[in-house]
């Protein structure tokens, strides 16, 4: 089973901007509701394959996308990744 990571945002504008940038980079993403266990100012999150983490991080930093954090799922909860 492929592992997916989750990006949480503080604003819908930043979530939609990230969606556009990641799709343009041909990264497989899924726009989804922010899980209850993740504190964020926006109800939208983006899931992406863990194998694309380095490229996603590069795009976020280069394009100065404001995010709350990137999370991985451990058992039934989400854990924030360190930068």
Residue ranges and their predicted role:
Residues 11-15, 19, 66, 81-83:
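Short N-terminal helix-initiation segments at or just after the protein's N-terminus
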Residues 50-83:
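C-terminal structural segments of small proteins and small subunits
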Residues 6, 12, 16, 21-23, ...:
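Amphipathic, hydrophobic secondary-structure cores in small proteins
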């Amino acid at each position: 089973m492929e592992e997916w990571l989750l990006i949480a945002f503080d604003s819908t504008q930043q979530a939609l901007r990230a969606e556009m940038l990641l799709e343009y980079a041909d990264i497989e993403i899924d726009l989804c509701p922010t899980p209850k266990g993740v504190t964020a100012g926006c109800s939208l999150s983006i899931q992406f394959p863990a194998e694309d983490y380095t490229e996603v991080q590069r795009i976020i930093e280069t394009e100065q996308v404001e995010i709350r954090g990137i999370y991985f799922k451990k058992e039934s909860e989400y854990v924030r990744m360190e930068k």
